[in-house]
Amino acid sequence: MEKLLIKGGKSLRGTIKCAGAKNAALPMIAATILSSENVILKNLPYLQDITTMFELLGSMGAKIVLNENMDFDISSNNLDDTEARYELVKTMRASILVLGPLVARYGRARIALPGGCAIGSRPVNFHLDALEQLGAKIILRNGYIEATANELVGTKIKFDGITVTGTENIMMAACLAKGTTYLTNVAKEPEIEDLANLLNAMWADVQGAGTDEIVINGVSNLHGTSFSIPADRIEAGTYLVAAAVTRGNVNVDGINPERLSKVIQKLEESGADISMTNNSIALSMENSELKPVDITTAPFPEFPTDMQAQFSVMNAIAKGTSNIYETVFENRFMHIQELNRMGCDIEINGNQAVIKGVKSLYGAEVMATDLRASASLILAGLCAEGQTTVSRIYHIDRGYERIEEKLNYLGAEILRLPS
């Protein structure tokens, strides 16, 4: 198991380009199941979760080729299996995204429940309830979701709670349903719009993605296309915060600022000097003092839960007290205990973190607990005095492409070491 060794105290400077968005790429890979023709996906990030999704499709009989342009040519026609086995699903909850496409295209699917997933408390039930409303029959048996359908039929569906993957799953399934499907109480994340754009490029008829209602007019089949994955807004936000906590000056290229409007707003409140084009965001904290900012996470277009941990670090070294309220996920403060080992002064009260700024953080041996928590520990190591070791970094490799290489390019000093 590898770890990262970080020597703190280096200001980050320079320009960096975002990788393709993991949260856009995963449903797009699943969407290739809907087509009888090849789909070419460009700008896919090189991440463990992408590899896992390819392994999942490959286990069903899909053919995936890296072509001469370094794009992935995917053929999911005539799959010989429609089962997503636990060995793969347990490592990535997004595996559930193949459920809707498999039932819509092949009339059947057997998907292992994601590891540690309690149906009552996680939004997987939103997927299942909505798929049943489209006409599927679903049985939960021996840790698997077994779904069948002779035909899916469009209907009006209101999700019981906002769910990104649930919205994506049903949006994909409805593309091959008979008639029109109306989805309300839907997620509005940019990645929903990205998926709709891909589906429409495959000759689907999806309208209203990113608004309060998504309308899908079913078609008989979808075609092949070539599509480029947009930049990862969470990766962009993470590097902007890295610049802020190291008192640096970094330009993130290839990202639409509108996708990070709330993050940018909070960075400006913190004292950062921000400049933007329609395709880049630059942040300078060289001549500013960090100010604490209060944050409440919520579904898009509000402040993203995936940036909460990074802002915890920024607030931890700001002068004053701040509050972070996590309203999207339970147990999203697991990084706080590790940050406190580095000198942070953070107290957790339920879904609230009260952060009292300190003068300095100090290097320590810390352990990542999840993807965004691992990012926060790396940021803390960058601005800490001395040396920090972050273990269990397989979490970071699930969502950040070559993070230590990119940060080193900006002036950090990070080594990847075997345990």
Enumerate the predicted regions with their spans.
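Short, structured segments at the rim of ligand-binding sites
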Residues: 1-419
